[in-house]
C-alpha cells in the first residue's frame, strides 16, 4: 500500500484540513491512473470513503476490470459498490459522453442520499482543467466563466470534491509507477469520436508543438484570473441585485444611467438578474438589452418561455399567469 503521497503539497494539505474526517464520502473509481491515485491519497489522509465503479460494458475487458477493482478494494479494506447500467454501445449514440456523465452524477447523488455520504471525490487533474478552460474559450464563454472546474462545488445539494486540480497528469502517473501500481488504460479516452479525446490526442499536442511551449500552465493561470474577476464582478453586482423588486408585471431590475457607463458590468448585472430567474441569456441578447437601455427605447423580447420588457431605466421579467 502507498502510505504517503504528496505529503508536502500545501494545497492538498489545505484541502484535506478543511474536510470533516468524521464524515464518510464516495470515491468515483474508474480504475484509471487518476482515480487510483486519489484512492491511495484518501487512504493516506485517513478519509473514510466507499469506492463506486460504473461498468458501462463498452469494452470487452470492462467486466474483468470491475472484478479486479472489487478485489483490490477488498485487499485495501475499502467498501466497494459496483453499478452496471443497461449496456449501450458508445458508437450508437451522438451524445453518449454527456449521457454517461449524467448517469454517473445521478447515481452519485442517489447513493449520497440513500447512504448519507457527505460528498463525492472525483479525480480531475490539471490537464483535465486545462482542457475544460480551452473548450470554454472556443465556445465563447464569458471572461468571468473561464475559471474551469472548482475544487469544491455543489451538484444539487451534494458536494463534488476535486483535490487534484493543481496536479499534472504526468506527476500522477509517475507516483503510481514509482510504487508499481497498475491501472486501467481506458481506450475510450482515446476514441476521437469524442470531443475530449480529440482535444487530448490531437489539439493539445498540436498547439504545444506549434507554440513551442507548455500551454497547460498559461490556461490554468487564465482560470485563476477568471476566478478573481468573477469574485470582483459578483461583489460589484450584489448591490444592484438587491434593488430588484416585484411589481404588477413581474420582477423589475432598476438600471441607473451611471451603471450604463460601464457596459461590461451593466451586461453582467443583467446576466445575473436573468440567471436568478433560471434564464440563460446569450451575449447577443444581453447586447440587445444594453442597446435599448442606452437609447431609452422600449422593447419586448423573448427569453426562453418568458417575456422581457426593456424600458428606460429598467428591465422587467414578466410574470407567467
From Swiss-Prot:
GO terms of molecular function: ATP binding; tRNA(Ile)-lysidine synthase activity
Lineage: Bacteria, Pseudomonadati, Chlamydiota, Chlamydiia, Chlamydiales
InterPro entries: Rossmann-like_a/b/a_fold (IPR014729), TilS/TtcA_N (IPR011063), tRNA_Ile_lys_synt (IPR012094), tRNA_Ile_lys_synt_N (IPR012795)
One Pfam family, short name: ATP_bind_3
Domain notes: The N-terminal region contains the highly conserved SGGXDS motif, predicted to be a P-loop motif involved in ATP binding.
Name of the protein in question: tRNA(Ile)-lysidine synthase
Family note: Belongs to the tRNA(Ile)-lysidine synthase family.
Job of this protein: Ligates lysine onto the cytidine present at position 34 of the AUA codon-specific tRNA(Ile) that contains the anticodon CAU, in an ATP-dependent manner. Cytidine is converted to lysidine, thus changing the amino acid specificity of the tRNA from methionine to isoleucine.
Positions that bind ATP: 30-35
Catalytic reaction equation(s): cytidine(34) in tRNA(Ile2) + L-lysine + ATP = lysidine(34) in tRNA(Ile2) + AMP + diphosphate + H(+)
Keywords assigned: ATP-binding, Cytoplasm, Ligase, Nucleotide-binding, tRNA processing
GO cellular component: cytoplasm
GO terms for biological process, alphabetical: tRNA modification
Localization of this protein: Cytoplasm
Enzyme Commission numbers on file: 6.3.4.19
Amino acid at each position: 500500500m502507498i502510505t504517503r503521497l504528496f505529503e508536502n503539497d500545501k494545497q492538498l494539505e489545505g484541502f484535506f484540513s478543511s474536510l470533516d474526517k468524521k464524515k464518510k464520502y464516495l470515491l468515483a473509481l474508474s480504475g484509471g491512473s487518476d482515480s487510483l491515485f486519489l484512492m491511495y491519497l484518501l487512504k493516506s489522509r485517513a478519509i473514510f470513503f466507499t469506492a463506486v465503479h460504473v461498468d458501462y460494458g463498452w469494452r470487452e475487458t470492462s467486466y474483468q476490470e470491475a472484478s479486479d477493482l472489487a478485489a483490490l478494494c477488498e485487499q485495501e479494506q475499502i467498501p466497494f459498490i459496483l453499478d452496471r447500467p443497461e449496456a449501450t454501445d458508445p458508437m450508437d449514440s451522438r451524445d453518449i459522453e454527456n449521457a454517461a456523465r449524467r448517469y454517473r452524477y445521478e447515481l452519485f447523488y442517489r447513493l449520497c442520499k440513500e447512504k448519507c455520504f457527505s460528498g463525492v471525490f472525483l479525480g480531475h487533474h490539471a490537464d483535465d482543467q486545462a482542457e475544460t478552460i480551452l473548450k470554454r474559450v472556443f465556445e465563447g464563454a464569458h471572461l468571468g466563466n473561464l475559471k474551469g472546474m472548482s475544487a469544491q462545488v455543489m451538484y444539487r445539494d451534494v458536494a463534488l470534491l476535486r483535490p487534484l486540480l493543481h496536479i499534472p497528469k504526468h506527476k500522477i502517473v509517475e507516483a503510481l509507477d514509482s510504487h508499481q501500481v497498475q491501472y486501467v488504460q481506458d481506450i475510450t479516452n482515446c476514441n476521437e469520436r469524442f470531443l475530449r479525446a480529440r482535444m487530448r490526442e490531437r489539439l493539445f499536442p498540436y498547439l504545444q508543438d506549434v507554440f513551442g511551449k507548455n500551454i497547460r500552465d498559461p490556461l490554468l493561470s487564465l482560470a485563476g484570473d477568471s476566478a478573481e474577476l468573477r469574485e470582483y464582478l459578483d461583489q460589484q453586482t450584489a448591490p444592484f441585485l438587491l434593488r430588484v423588486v416585484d411589481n404588477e408585471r413581474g420582477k423589475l431590475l432598476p438600471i441607473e444611467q451611471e451603471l450604463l457607463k460601464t457596459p461590461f458590468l451593466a451586461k453582467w448585472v443583467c446576466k445575473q438578474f436573468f440567471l436568478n430567474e433560471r434564464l440563460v441569456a446569450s451575449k447577443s441578447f444581453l447586447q440587445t438589452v444594453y442597446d435599448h437601455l442606452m437609447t431609452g427605447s422600449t422593447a419586448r423580447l423573448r427569453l426562453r418561455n418568458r417575456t422581457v420588457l426593456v424600458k428606460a431605466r429598467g428591465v422587467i421579467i414578466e410574470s407567467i399567469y
